[in-house]
Each structure stands twice: as C-alpha cells, then as structure tokens.
Amino acid sequence: MLAILDYKAGNQTSVQRALNKLGIPNQITSDKEVLSKATGIIFPGVGAAGQAMDELTSGGLDELLKDLVQQKKPLLGICVGCQILLDYSEENDTQALSVIPGECRLFNPSWEDYEGVPIRVPHMGWNQIELKQDCILFKDIDPEAHFYFVHSYYPAPEEKYIIGETIYGRPFCSLHGREGLWAVQFHPEKSGRPGLKLLSNFYEYCKEVSDA
C-alpha cells in the first residue's frame, strides 16, 4: 500500500485519483504508524514552502520523514514536496528538511526563451524532461513525453543528485534524488499517460523492495 502524506499542504486527492485509476492500493494519512508500515510514501505539496514546513513540523511529520528516508523507505516528492526535501527554499526564507543537499530558488524573470522573450513566472504548462542519469521511474516512458508544471521556484540540488532537467529560459533541475528517494517538480498525477506510468513504476519499485 502506498501512503499519501496528509499534512494540509498537498494535492492529495488528485494523487489518490491517479493511483485509484491504476488500481494501486493507497491511503491518504498523517498517521505515523500507517506511514511507517506503508510500502512507499508519496509526499505531495502545493502552495508555499513556509506553510508546508509549518504543517509538517507542527505534527512531528518532519522528523518522521527524515527517519523513514534514513531507513530507505521509498519516497516520491511532488512539487512543493520535491522542493522542501532540500536544505533551504528562498520562498518565505524557509529552512527545509535537509534530506537532499541543495536549495530551492525563484525563477529569474530576466531569463529568455528560445525566441528571446523573457520567461513568465510561474512556469505553467507542459514541458519535457532530459534525463542526466538512468531512472527506474522513467522505465518504458517515451523520452519525448511531456509533463505538467506549475511553479515559481525550482530545485537546485548538488549536481550528483540531479537526475533530470527541463528547459525554461535555461536548464533547471526537474527531477532529483537517488535510488528509492525521488523528487519531481512536475505533477505526474496531472500529466496523462506518462505521469500514470511514472506512478506505476514507483509502485512496482516499492513492491520489489518490500519483497526483497
């Protein structure tokens, strides 16, 4: 069973609808025992980084997440959940979870697209991922596939944790982490067939690890 972390700052219901469509058993929960026993955890998030961290820390879920990552529990962070796995976010001057070294930065509106036009902030719409490392999440996904983004801040982890990049004015990290701990800036639950496949790949990985 996949646990969808409920901390009042996520897009839990849209993630759950996607998992239900795939027939993947899941539960939206903030119960620490349920989270600890889950096959894997999806850590969604929308809104502001500061509010998200406040909600996590108020219930002690920040320390639980760190402990579960230390125990190699598979975890997938989405959007704000992706960003606050890093050390720091410029949004609200937020000290984050420090699970992955790096920080989250505001897009520079002076960046220009391929036509020389300044980019719009937030980055909103469909874009591609260029993998910099092999990633099991992208198994059997078309390299030309597009995923849905909506964000004003982007993750900037240490280089060795960058798994995929997307171009918006210039390249930025849109997928980071390591095996068993992944963070995506885009919304797989809103990305049609490629996004559903990514979620399915995450679940299959979780089952393999659980059965090992």
UniProtKB/Swiss-Prot annotation:
Active-site positions on this chain: C79, H187, E189
Superkingdom of origin organism: Bacteria
Keywords attached to this entry: Amino-acid biosynthesis, Cytoplasm, Glutamine amidotransferase, Histidine biosynthesis, Hydrolase, Lyase
A GO molecular-function descriptor: lyase activity
Residue ranges occupied by any Glutamine amidotransferase type-1 domain in the UniProt entry: 1-212
Keyword Hydrolase: yes
Classification via CDD domains: GATase1_IGP_Synthase
Reactions this protein catalyses: 5-[(5-phospho-1-deoxy-D-ribulos-1-ylimino)methylamino]-1-(5-phospho-beta-D-ribosyl)imidazole-4-carboxamide + L-glutamine = D-erythro-1-(imidazol-4-yl)glycerol 3-phosphate + 5-amino-1-(5-phospho-beta-D-ribosyl)imidazole-4-carboxamide + L-glutamate + H(+); L-glutamine + H2O = L-glutamate + NH4(+)
Entry annotated with the keyword Nucleotidyltransferase: no
Pfam families documented for this protein: GATase
Signal peptide (UniProt feature, chain positions): none
Pathway: Amino-acid biosynthesis; L-histidine biosynthesis; L-histidine from 5-phospho-alpha-D-ribose 1-diphosphate: step 5/9
Location, primary (coarse class): cytoplasm
Family annotation (Gene3D superfamilies): 3.40.50.880
Enzyme Commission identifier(s): 4.3.2.10, 3.5.1.2
InterPro entries tied to this protein: Class_I_gatase-like, GATASE, Imidazole-glycPsynth_HisH
Any one GO CC term of the record: cytoplasm
Compartment(s): Cytoplasm
BP GO annotations: L-histidine biosynthetic process
Subunit structure: Heterodimer of HisH and HisF.
Role description: IGPS catalyzes the conversion of PRFAR and glutamine to IGP, AICAR and glutamate. The HisH subunit catalyzes the hydrolysis of glutamine to glutamate and ammonia as part of the synthesis of IGP and AICAR. The resulting ammonia molecule is channeled to the active site of HisF.
Protein name per the record: Imidazole glycerol phosphate synthase subunit HisH
Organism of this sequence: Maridesulfovibrio salexigens (strain ATCC 14822 / DSM 2638 / NCIMB 8403 / VKM B-1763)
